[in-house]
UniProtKB/Swiss-Prot annotation:
Coiled coil: none annotated. One of its GO terms (cellular component) is endocytic vesicle. It comes from the Eukaryota. Belongs to the HEATR5 family. The modification Phosphoserine is found at S1110, S1647. This is HEAT repeat-containing protein 5A. The modification Phosphothreonine is found at T1115. GO terms for biological process: endocytosis; protein localization; retrograde transport, endosome to Golgi. HEAT repeats lie at residues 846-883, 1079-1116. Keywords: Phosphoprotein, Repeat. Residues 1646-1668 are annotated as: Disordered.
């Protein structure tokens, strides 16, 4: 293929190829040429032009296929447009000659068609350059058209379209001729030709003769397919729209005599088409007289689409202006003045569907939310008008006149359409519609409620559905509406209309409850149940109302079931009783019944029993949890009787006639539906009877063939439906298109066919339910049930039934036979499907034969859907039999049929059967079998005489490729060649063949998979072919083929991304982003979603580049140039209604945001801001809110919330609330993304600095004003969902930016300036009408804002605090005083949210207060703090303190509730019957979730409060409370006023203590996987707070089992949670437990001493663990549990401590390591705990644990003793030394009973430390000598002398000191001197003297050495100074007779460092410091040891002179004065010295 990449065709390479390859080669060359020509210079093109033209024209004769001729024409046109146009006329003449040719052979046809295409392309590109040649050309083409076949007509139409496009107005002379040709083509038998003609006419058609154009279009709709309806409706709609808006007489259009047509005329024209179709007036009138309808459904559907195109073309603004006229016209289509449109119910339902579609698509799709609100008002007006008309008629006294009035009957359809659209509109508007319902002038609810009494059942149902929509959109109206309807129903029980109407309304409203998370009050269920019972009981009292009351009663019960188990469980007994009573008790009673009664009573009876069946079905569907064994047993008894009645129905029907026909069908349907849901075992005894009835239903058809077709789609495989009618495919017009599936005389689904469906959720999203007529529904249920029942009866019975079914097919004829066959096949299919699914078996051989005969017959049925279902059953049959030979036999049957049969039906059926076999049974093992299959399908795929056969064969081939897997590899190349050959040759008019080819190509790409990345020649060729195939499909005019192309490219991109041209793929995706075809849009989004996961930035760039290149193909809807691909997707999301597509758009945007939000921050924030601001009507809100602020804050508010002044055209016009919610969620995601990026996003100073450095830098903090503004706009919107999102955004902003400082105002944070805005955003959420979920969210934001510390000024803080206070006042009355609009659990949610918010504020206040109590350095600091507001911590606590008394009681009540709710189910019977303080017993399940979300912080706050009281406030009433309402008392916190038994304070404390401890332990014990970190941390902090106080500690200390249990729980937490913060918090609790145990032991010892009077005794009594044996029992020992826990922590951080891991019993020498900060903190905390343990033990016990503790402590020291710069100790070393000191100082080391053992163990420990450190061994070089030396020092100083003074240890210690003194490292030397300093000072001479004897001389030598060479740096200076300090200490501790000698050594060294006056000036800083140090020391030593001093100075004149000079030189700078008095005490000879010192 590379050889095809040249400017001229490489003929040499071309001629060497075979026929198929030649076509491929040419196509590849032409593809390349198109790109090359556009990139080549004009001169280069002209050089080669002549040859190139010849090559291109010669290709015309080579029979090019459709894609090739299109490319050829395109290249020819490009070539002439770039090069010279001299020879263009020759080219045109040549083409015309080819067209004129008389050769009509099929082989010459491609040449003629290529010539036609070339002409079109040339004229399109060159236009007027070609002069007047077009008249001849057009004439020639039109002449050719007369004899052309369909393909020719198709290409001619497209070519004429191009010619007219290129010539523009110049082509006017030809318009008439072209119009004539197009007119005939619009009604062509080929659908493709009709489409082409419509596209052609759209170019030049104007409103010259609108009537004839319209009539022509109406004719074109007759017998049309989906594509024709789309094209022709587009033509008609656009022409009519142009006619309405053509108002510029100066334009070129006016020269074509355009007349402006009024809107009324246009609408009348469309209305005529809708009502009369394409027939003329006379024919239509004749039809009316005959009472027949001449308008076929396809015409009506076509006109419906034209209406939509017409309005869409004119746009939303036009519709808004002309809404009233348009709406009344559309409604009139279903009006009484056009009875023909609605003369039968079937017609009426279809007509209503069309009207609803027009309204939904225009009002719902084009209008923004404001315009929709106005539309709602108009619709209400229309409803009122229609209501008045009805009232006028109904007021007529004559009942007959009333009921017979055509007005009432016909206006019903207008009302139904109006009500349904009203419901849809409000449903979509959501809570945005709230102002409308509050507007009394509109009277919206009244208008709907008024028509609930309409005589027509359809209207009553539509009104009920409309109420359902209002309730879903506005949950706050659900309960009031329910109350109103129940009240009316109770009050109007004697009106049949009221009973049915209001029962429908109540049922619809109950159906809405599942869509409203806040629910309805639980008590409503009881009211409804009572009313339903009352209706059922009173039904018999009044025969006029019997049927209505019966239906209403059961309808209410059925709807009640949708409320779920929580509600139904309370009424189940009554329901089961009614269920039992509705059926006779025995068959005998049933017989008696039959003989009594009349037609009417049976009608009522059947209605009642059908209703009861429906109620039980609803129960089984919605309350599965209640279906226990016991309930099932109570359900079953009436079933046999219900089945008995089923078998008797036919005889009852004969007896009482046709009035019972519908009730009996409904009864059957209800029973079948119930049985499908129940397990077959429950009706085992009736299986045979049921089966017989099913067989009778299925074989006694009274419906048409077309109607039965609806059964088949669910039985076909989803993929197979693609090869069938487009009606089965999802399109934007499916709502109206699906009518055509059933044929003209068949009813579509509609609500009035089954009122019981009003409370069920519609399968297709949220539109009104559309149940089919009972006659169809019963067949559907029967066929499903047949599958189940047939699988459970005995084999004999099964055989008999199948035989009976087969016979019934044989014995019927004609259309009737088709219906029976259809029913039977669908039933057998569901049977096979059921058996295959349940892994059952088919039965005897005979069964196989019957099944085979049945399916075989259907495989050859003329109905394609039936063939499809049969192919599926064929494969299922093989799957069920599961026998290789049988499967092979089936395949062989199909082979034989395909070889012999020539008819399309057999060939399509059996080819699909082969594919289905492979799908269910894989590759059917044998490759020979696979070869045969592929061979046959190849042959069929090339049968160009039948596109159907090709389509089915190729589809089957795609299934085989998919299922064969690797087995297919050998066939890949030939299959790919076949696909490419067919793609290049099959005419584009056969789109279905191309679609199947696309599926094959897709399957092949999947089969090749990642191998497509390979570089071998064969793979490269395959890849090129795949790409070429995709290119052909991308150019196909059919949208589904284009979708397949995109899907194939998506697969290719997944497996071989480098080889797919991303730029062209993205370009293709952008062009089709707003395609009118749903499936194409879905394919585009699915592909985009995949691309952006890998290459979001590249995709986005390509899209923008494409938009900048301003290609004309880009749809104006996708405004990529202005808003980028991201913005285009947001716009699309706003307009899109398909749920799957919306999901994909959101996913795509999320992926793009994740990878690009940080880089394109401004773009993303602008998009979100534009979406949120586009329809934010927040000017008013701002005014209202700021009015409530103080004057000074207005400026702040305005700074962020100014309204947009620039009302420029906005990329987002009126986005819907759902889009705005998504934008708000995006903002939160953007903030999260920035959090993981650069820290500058949350540091304004750094951000500004980096922005200055490079202006392209962008940081989130710079957009804070926008973030606040967006959050404000969202939080104050009308839409509740948006308010929730806005509050969440505000919460995220507060949490992320609370600590960002404001650089311009030190001590302040950046958020402080927005406090007015935050207040204004929060305030609306606390109004009385706000829903609880919004208030709950706002409470969370309030507490976050107060806790964030942003606001320091208490007055500012009070505003938000006041909101929480108001909430607290509201909730004080507990569950009694809260809203009755929602379920009680909603009140629980709100109460707990308020309490949680207060808890958070209190926790923060206490923490700040604690931090603030840390002593402040100076008073000035304190004053500054107050001035800066940082000292508001006490103030905040004061704010909370005012309400703390109330809060504490409420918190305790909430915790008690939570404790009750978390009890295991076995305690359910003991729970209080009325519920808890804040929940009711009935709603406890729903309430649990809210408690789970809130309990942790409430627990922490309660614990803090109890801590603050020290457990000494017995009654919370004593706490300050400023609230007057009484708090709900609970047993937990009853005051003396409660009237209950008064508890002692001790009991109250104990209860509270156990409540908090119990909740904590229960939670920590069984941590759920979804337990949040916040909850665990809060729980641990609560325990910490609890144990901060003596009283709870004493409880824990005295109850050892409790302590152990708690430790075990904490151990588990540490094991299961890796978070360091949680583990640290757990360790802190452990430490407190040990403290509690210590205190307990101390207390026992103290009291024992006091009791025994033994205070003077030396021995301590035996208290503590270990008693007098020292044994610690695992599970019973607190110490053991603590050790386990600490070992766990230590070994996790330092695995080397585990002897099992290291394989060594002792502390093994390994390289030390530094732990991370978290690890260090954990290890340190564990060591602190270990060091406390001996104090909890008895002396014997301490001996047991000491080895372990020492091993671990020394182990940590050894493992982490790393050398750090500057001689620092690592935190773990410091902790281990501290712990060591604690252990060594333990009283147990000195206790009489343990002293000896401790001494031995401590000596061993010291030996271990000494052994760790051996300078000879190389591996120890890493160890820090200072750490080990410090450890030795701790031993020396902290233990009793007998530990360290034994000679061997003492000698080793001294050696270590000597060794370190020799180390050159100055840091080590300094530390050694410091340690020796402390040892030398040790008061016990036995310890210190050996060290002094051994080391003093050594130190002296060192100092003299320094003295000789003088220090050169600070380190040496420090060493010297420390050395001197050690010598000074020696002097101090030395005995008197040695002291003079030591001073004599010390003084010369000090004096030698003194400088005289001259030297001091020039000395280095080190020498100067040394001088100062020496002088200072001399000044101190002189007076202390004056005699030695004097004698030394006297004996050495040099020293004396030096000292005098130094003092003299220093007299200015040194301020240290030696007191004269000391020297004057002993005057002597040394007067000069005295003089000097005196002088000083």
């Amino acid at each position: 293929m590379e050889l095809a990449h040249s400017l001229l065709l490489n003929e040499e390479a071309y001629n060497q190829l075979g026929e198929v390859q030649k076509a491929e080669f040419i196509f590849e060359w032409l593809r390349y040429l198109e790109k090359l020509l556009l990139a080549t210079s004009r001169n280069d093109v002209r050089e080669k032009q002549k040859t190139l033209v010849e090559q291109l024209l010669s290709l015309l004769n080579s029979s090019p296929g459709p894609p090739t001729r299109k490319l050829l024409a395109k290249n020819l046109a490009i070539l002439y447009s770039i090069g010279d146009t001299f020879s263009v006329h020759e080219a045109i003449d040549k083409c015309n000659d080819l067209i004129r040719s008389k050769d009509d052979s099929p082989s010459y046809l491609p040449t003629k068609l290529a010539a036609v295409v070339c002409l079109g392309s040339l004229y399109k590109k060159l236009g007027r350059i070609l002069g007047n040649t077009f008249t001849d050309t057009v004439g020639n083409i039109l002449k050719a058209m007369k004899s052309a076949e369909s393909q020719g007509r198709y290409e001619i139409m497209l070519s004429l379209q191009n010619i007219l496009n290129g010539l523009g107005a110049a082509a006017a002379p030809c318009h008439r001729d072209v119009y004539k040709a197009a007119r005939s083509c619009l009604t062509d038998r080929s659908m493709a030709v009709r489409c082409a003609a419509a596209k052609n006419e759209a170019i030049f058609m104007w409103s010259t003769d609108l009537d004839s154009v319209a009539t022509l279009c109406f004719k074109s709709f007759e017998g049309s397919n989906y594509d024709v309806r789309i094209s022709v409706s587009k033509l008609l709609g656009i022409i009519l729209a142009k006619a309405v808006i053509s108002k510029h007489p100066g334009t070129a259009a006016s020269r074509q005599s355009i007349r402006r047509v009024s809107l009324e005329e246009v609408l009348e024209l469309l209305g005529t088409g809708f009502l009369r179709g394409s027939s003329g007036f006379l024919r239509a009138s004749g039809d009316m007289l005959k009472g027949t309808s001449s308008v076929s459904r396809d015409v009506r559907v076509g006109v419906t689409q034209a209406y939509v195109v017409f309005v869409s073309t004119l746009g939303g603004a036009w519709l808004e202006k002309n809404f009233a006229a348009f709406f009344s016209h559309i409604l009139s289509l279903a009006s009484p003045s056009h009875p023909k449109a609605t003369q039968t119910q079937i017609d009426a339902v279809c007509c209503r569907r069309c009207v609803s579609f027009i309204l939904r698509t225009t009002i719902g799709g084009l209008l923004g939310e404001k315009a929709q609100l106005a539309a709602v008002k108009d619709i209400c007006q229309a409803i009122w008008k229609l209501k008045k008309v009805m009232d006028a008629v109904m007021s007529d006294g004559n009942l007959e006149t009333r009921l017979g009035s055509t007005d009432v009957a016909a206006s019903q359809h207008m009302l139904v359409c109006a009500l349904q659209e009203l419901g849809n509109l409000i449903h979509n508007l959501g809570t945005t519609a709230a102002p409308l319902l509050q507007d009394s002038s509109t009277g919206l609810l009244d208008s709907i409620l008024s028509v609930i009494l309409h005589p027509s059942i359809s209207v009553r149902l539509a009104a009920a559905w409309c109420l359902h929509c209002i309730a879903v959109a506005l949950p706050s109206y659900l309960t009031p509406l329910l109350d109103r309807c129940l009240e009316r129903l109770t009050g109007h029980k004697s009106s049949p209309e009221a009973v049915t109407g209001f029962s429908f309304a109540v049922a619809a409203l109950l159906g809405a409850v599942k869509h409203c998370p806040l629910g309805i009050p639980h008590g409503k269920g009881k009211i409804i149940m009572t009313l339903a019972e009352d209706l059922l009981c009173s039904a018999a009292q009044n025969s006029r109302l019997s049927a209505q009351r019966t239906q209403a009663g059961w309808l209410l019960i059925s709807a009640l079931m949708t409320l779920g188990p929580a509600v139904v469980s309370h009424h189940l007994a009554r329901v089961l009783l009614l269920w039992k009573c509705v059926f006779p008790a025995s068959p005998k009673d049933l017989e008696t019944e039959k003989s009594r009664g009349d037609s009417f009573t049976w009608q009522v009876t059947l209605e009642g029993r059908a209703g009861a069946l429906c109620a039980i079905k609803s129960f089984v569907s919605h309350c599965g949890d209640l279906l226990t064994e016991e309930v099932t047993q109570r359900l079953l008894p009436p079933l046999p009787c219900a089945v008995d009645l089923l078998t008797q129905l036919s005889s009852i029907l004969k007896m009482y006639g046709s009035p019972l026909k519908t009730p009996s069908v409904v009864y059957r349907q209800r029973l079948y539906e119930l049985l499908i849901l129940l397990p077959p075992e429950t009706y085992e005894g009736n299986l045979c009877a049921i089966l017989r009835e099913l067989a009778a239903d299925l074989t006694a058809p009274d419906i048409q063939v077309a109607a039965s077709t609806f059964l088949l789609p669910p039985l076909c495989h989803q993929d197979d439906l693609l090869i069938l009618s487009p009606f089965l495919q999802e399109t934007d017009h499916r709502f109206i298109e699906e009518q055509l599936l059933l044929g003209n005389g068949v009813a579509c689904g509609s609500l009035e066919y089954d009122p019981y469906s009003i409370y069920e959720k519609d399968v297709e999203g949220d539109s009104v339910p559309k149940p089919l007529p009972p006659a169809l529904s019963v067949i559907s249920s029967a066929s499903k049930l047949f599958g189940v029942v047939c699988a459970h009866v005995g084999e004999t019975q099964r055989l008999l039934i199948l035989e009976q079914l087969l016979d019934s097919i044989k014995h019927t004829k004609g259309a009737r036979q088709q219906v029976v066959q259809l029913h039977v096949v669908s039933s057998v299919s569901s049977f096979l499907k059921y058996v295959a699914g349940s892994k059952g078996c088919l039965g005897p051989e005979e069964m196989k034969r019957f099944a085979l005969t049945l399916v075989m017959g259907a495989l050859e049925s003329p109905n394609p859907l039936l063939r499809c279902a049969a192919a599926e059953s064929w494969a299922r049959l093989a799957q069920v039999v599961d026998d290789g030979a049988f499967t092979a036999g089936l395949a062989q049957v199909s082979f034989d049929k395909l070889k012999s049969a020539r008819d399309v039906v057999t060939r399509t059926g059996h080819s699909l059967a082969l594919g289905s076999l492979h799908r269910y049974l894989g590759g059917i093992s044998s490759s020979q079998h696979l070869n045969s299959c592929i061979g046959i399908l190849y042959t069929l795929a090339q049968d160009s005489t039948s596109p159907d056969v090709q389509t089915w064969a190729l589809h089957s081939l795609s299934l085989i490729i998919d299922s064969a897997g690797p087995l297919y590899y050998v066939h890949v190349e030939p299959t790919l060649s076949l696909i490419i050959m067919l793609l290049l040759n099959v005419p584009p008019t056969h789109a279905e063949v191309h679609q199947s080819l696309g599926r094959c190509l897709n399957a092949l790409i999947t089969t090749l998979g990642p191998e497509l990345q390979g570089n071998s020649t064969s793979i490269s060729t395959l890849r090129t072919s795949c790409l070429l195939g995709c290119a052909v499909m991308q150019d196909n005019p059919d949208c589904l083929v284009q979708a397949q192309a995109i899907s194939c490219l998506q697969q290719l991109h997944m497996f071989a991304p480098r080889h797919v041209n991303l730029s062209s793929l993205v370009s293709c995706l952008c062009v089709n982003l707003c395609s009118p075809y749903l499936l194409l849009r879905r394919a585009v989004l699915a592909c985009l979603r995949q691309l952006v996961q890998r290459e979001a930035a590249e995709v986005s760039e390509h899209a923008v580049m494409l938009a900048k290149d301003s290609r004309e193909e880009l749809t104006p809807d996708a405004n990529i140039r202005e808003v980028g691909l991201e913005g285009a997707l947001l716009i699309l999301l706003d307009k899109e209604t398909d749920e799957r597509l919306c999901h994909d758009i959101k996913e795509t945007l999320n992926y793009m945001l994740t990878s690009m939000a940080v880089e394109k921050l401004s773009l993303w924030l602008k998009l979100c801001k534009d979406v949120l601001a586009a329809s934010a009507d927040f000017t008013a809100v701002t005014c209202v809110d700021t009015m409530q602020e103080e004057e000074g804050d207005k400026g702040d508010d305005a700074s962020v919330l100014t309204t947009r002044r620039d009302e420029k055209s906005h990329p987002f016009t009126n986005p819907r609330w759902a889009t705005r919610v998504f934008a708000a969620e995006c903002v939160c995601r953007i903030i999260n993304q920035c959090e993981n990026a650069n820290s500058a996003h949350f540091d304004i100073a750094l951000a500004q600095e980096m922005k200055k450095r490079d202006s392209r830098n962008d940081f989130l903090v710079l957009h804070l004003a926008d973030l606040i503004r967006m959050a404000f706009m969202a939080a104050t919107d009308h839409s509740d969902q948006l308010r929730l999102s806005g509050l969440e955004m505000l919460l995220v902003v507060i949490r992320r930016f609370a600590t960002v400082p404001e650089p311009e105002f030190p001590g302040h944070v950046i958020l402080e300036q927005y406090q007015a805005n935050v207040g204004a955003a929060l305030r609306p959420a606390f109004t009385s009408e706000t829903p609880p979920d919004v208030t709950a969210k706002a409470c969370q934001v309030c507490s976050a804002w107060i806790a964030s510390g942003v606001v320091s000024d208490l007055n500012d803080l009070r505003r938000v605090h006041q909101l929480l206070v108001s909430s607290l006042t509201k909730i004080q009355a507990g569950k009694e005083a809260l809203s009755h609009l929602y379920n009680e659990s909603a009140s629980t949610m709100e109460i707990l949210a308020v309490l949680k918010a207060w808890a958070e504020v209190y926790i923060i206040a206490v923490q700040r207060h604690k931090n603030h109590r840390q002593p402040l350095k100076t008073t000035t600091c304190l004053e500054d703090g107050i001035r800066n507001g940082s000292c508001s911590s006490d103030g905040l606590l004061d704010l909370v303190y005012a309400d703390l008394g109330t809060l504490s009681r409420l918190w305790l009540a909430a915790l008690q509730d939570f404790a009750l709710l978390t009890l295991p189910s076995e305690f359910a019977s003991q729970l209080p019957a009325e519920g808890g303080a804040f929940y009711t017993a009935e709603t406890s399940e729903n309430a649990k979730l809210h408690y789970y979300n809130s309990w942790a912080l409430i627990l922490h706050a309660t614990a803090l409060w109890l801590t603050s009281t020290g457990f000494v406030v017995a009654d919370p009433d004593e706490g300050a409370s400023n609230l007057s309402r009484p708090v709900t008392p609970t047993s937990m916190c009853q005051g003396s006023s409660s009237g209950a038994t008064i508890k002692s304070p001790e009991d109250v404390y104990t209860d509270r203590f156990h409540l908090i401890l119990g909740i904590s332990v229960e939670f920590l014990c069984s941590l759920r996987s979804d337990a949040t970190m916040e909850s665990i941390t809060a729980c641990l902090h609560a325990l910490q707070a609890l144990l901060d106080v003596p009283w709870p500690r004493s409880k824990i200390g005295s109850d050892q089992d409790l302590g152990i249990e708690l430790l075990n729980v904490l151990h588990r937490v540490i094991l299961t949670r890796e978070s360091p913060s949680i583990q640290l918090a757990s360790l802190e609790v452990v430490r407190q437990i040990i403290c509690a145990a210590q205190e307990h032991v101390k207390e026992k010892r103290r009291s024992a001493e006091v009791d025994d009077g033994a205070a003077e005794k030396e021995t301590l009594p035996e208290f503590g663990e270990g008693k007098d044996t020292g044994g610690l029992v695992p599970g019973k020992s607190l110490v053991f549990a603590t050790l386990e826990l600490c070992v766990c922590i230590l070994v996790r951080q330092l695995p080397e401590l585990n002897p099992k891991l290291t394989g060594s019993p002792g502390v093994k020498a390994t390289k030390p390591q530094i732990l991370l900060e978290d690890g260090s903190r954990l290890v340190s905390a564990a060591l602190v705990i270990l060091s406390e343990l001996p104090a909890v033990c008895s002396p014997e016990g301490s001996i047991s644990i000491l080895p372990t503790i020492l091993y671990l402590t020394i182990g940590v020291l050894r493992e982490t003793a790393v050398k750090l710069p500057g001689g620092q100790l690592s935190s773990t070393v410091a902790a281990s030394l501290q712990a060591l000191k604690g252990i060594l100082s333990s009283p147990m080391a000195r206790a009489e009973k343990s002293r000896t053992a401790w001494t031995d163990l401590l000596r061993s420990a010291l030996t271990t430390i000494l052994d760790c450190w051996d300078p000879v061994d190389e591996t120890h070089q890493e160890l820090d000598e200072v750490s080990l030396l410090t450890a030795i020092t701790v031993f020396i100083l902290s233990t009793s002398p007998e530990v360290t003074t034994i000679p061997c240890l003492q000698k080793r210690c001294i050696d270590k000191f000597k060794a370190t003194l020799e180390i050159k490292d100055p840091v080590v030397q300094i530390k050694t001197y410091q340690l020796l300093h402390s040892i030398f000072q040790y008061p016990n001479p036995a310890v210190s003297y050996p060290y002094i004897y051994s080391l003093a001389s050594c130190i002296m030598e060192k100092l003299q050495e320094i003295d000789k060479r003088k220090p050169e740096n600070t380190a040496e200076l420090e060493i010297f100074q420390e050395g001197i300090k050690v010598l000074e200490t020696l002097v101090t501790v030395a005995e008197e007779h040695h002291r003079a000698q030591l001073v004599a050594c010390l003084l010369p060294i000090l004096i030698s460092f003194l400088l005289d006056e001259n030297s001091l000036g020039s000395a280095t800083s080190i020498m100067r410091n040394l001088h100062d140090f020496a002088l200072q020391n001399l000044m101190q030593i002189g007076p202390q040891y004056s005699s030695v001093f004097k004698s030394l100075v006297a004996s050495s004149p040099a020293l004396k002179a030096r000292l005098e000079a130094a003092i003299k030189g220093n007299q200015e700078s040194v301020k240290v004065k030696i007191p004269t008095s000391k020297y004057t005490k002993s005057p002597g000879k040394n007067s000069s010295i005295q003089l000097k010192t005196s002088f000083l």
